[in-house]
Amino acid sequence: MTAQLIDGNALSRQLRAEVAQRATALKARGTTPGLAVVLVGDNPASQVYVRNKVKACEDAGFHSVLEKYDASMTEAELLARVEALNNDPSIHGILVQLPLPAHIDDHKVIETISPLKDVDGFHVASAGALMVGEVGFKACTPYGCMKMLESIGMKDLRGKHAVVIGRSNIVGKPMAMMLLAANATVTICHSGTADLAAMTRQADIVVAAVGKRNVLTADMCKPGAVVIDVGMNRNDEGKLCGDVDFDGVKEVAGFITPVPGGVGPMTITMLLVNTMEAAERAAG
């Protein structure tokens, strides 16, 4: 049995088309969705991510602002820029690209973003809303993973055991909360887990999000499981790969996301969805 692919590019195209329609409708009422992207320093990977985000905004008919600053920018200067964007009515979403230079406190910057414009879903208010089931912006990567599950008919996960490998604030923790909200029984595994394979072999759904190659191999996978690979790594030939041993696991799993072309495009798509929702809320 070879697993069916969950195509993140195809699902993204569908969802982005829906966002573009919503943007057109909102613009007809006099409001253009606006996203500000702030980049500090010249990290090559960050530059690529930022470029892709700005292009996706423009393709959806959004107003986008890209602010690039030298790595020598002070924390106080960056916080002042974020406050200015908080007060700009044409901007509905603010994204500060991480990582920031070492002298700037990521947490302080994220907490300065207005929760009403926190389209990355990283603010403590957004995380708290997710925890208690209130309305708030969901972190884009796990939100995209949930949409991928929905696309294969897995919206209500009652009776399903989901294992999340990774406990980051950006993916692992919010992923677990979203799976829990969908009625899954959730296990979170990490570097302190004694027997990872014993956990994953019981899992109907595995989300791998640690940034380490081959963290999930075929012998660790339950036949027919759904495997979502959030990882972004390079193999020995320098090619992009995920956290999952794709060639091995696809012979055991029922569904699997590829890398590239899986979770990656969905992350940007859900950023657009969040920005669209922020603009609609602001417009009333």
UniProtKB/Swiss-Prot annotation:
GO terms for molecular function: methenyltetrahydrofolate cyclohydrolase activity; methylenetetrahydrofolate dehydrogenase (NADP+) activity. One of its GO terms (cellular component) is cytosol. PROSITE patterns: THF_DHG_CYH_1, THF_DHG_CYH_2. It comes from the Bacteria. Its EC number is 1.5.1.5, 3.5.4.9. InterPro entries: Aminoacid_DH-like_N_sf, NAD(P)-bd_dom_sf, THF_DH/CycHdrlase, THF_DH/CycHdrlase_cat_dom, THF_DH/CycHdrlase_CS, THF_DH/CycHdrlase_NAD-bd_dom. One of its GO terms (biological process) is L-histidine biosynthetic process. NADP(+) binds at G166, R167, S168, S191. Coiled coil: none annotated. Keywords: Amino-acid biosynthesis, Histidine biosynthesis, Hydrolase, Methionine biosynthesis, Multifunctional enzyme, NADP, One-carbon metabolism, Oxidoreductase, Purine biosynthesis. It catalyses: (6R)-5,10-methylene-5,6,7,8-tetrahydrofolate + NADP(+) = (6R)-5,10-methenyltetrahydrofolate + NADPH; (6R)-5,10-methenyltetrahydrofolate + H2O = (6R)-10-formyltetrahydrofolate + H(+). Pathway: One-carbon metabolism; tetrahydrofolate interconversion. Catalyzes the oxidation of 5,10-methylenetetrahydrofolate to 5,10-methenyltetrahydrofolate and then the hydrolysis of 5,10-methenyltetrahydrofolate to 10-formyltetrahydrofolate. Belongs to the tetrahydrofolate dehydrogenase/cyclohydrolase family. Homodimer. NCBIfam families: PRK10792.1 (NF008058), PRK14186.1 (NF010783), PRK14189.1 (NF010786). This is Bifunctional protein FolD.
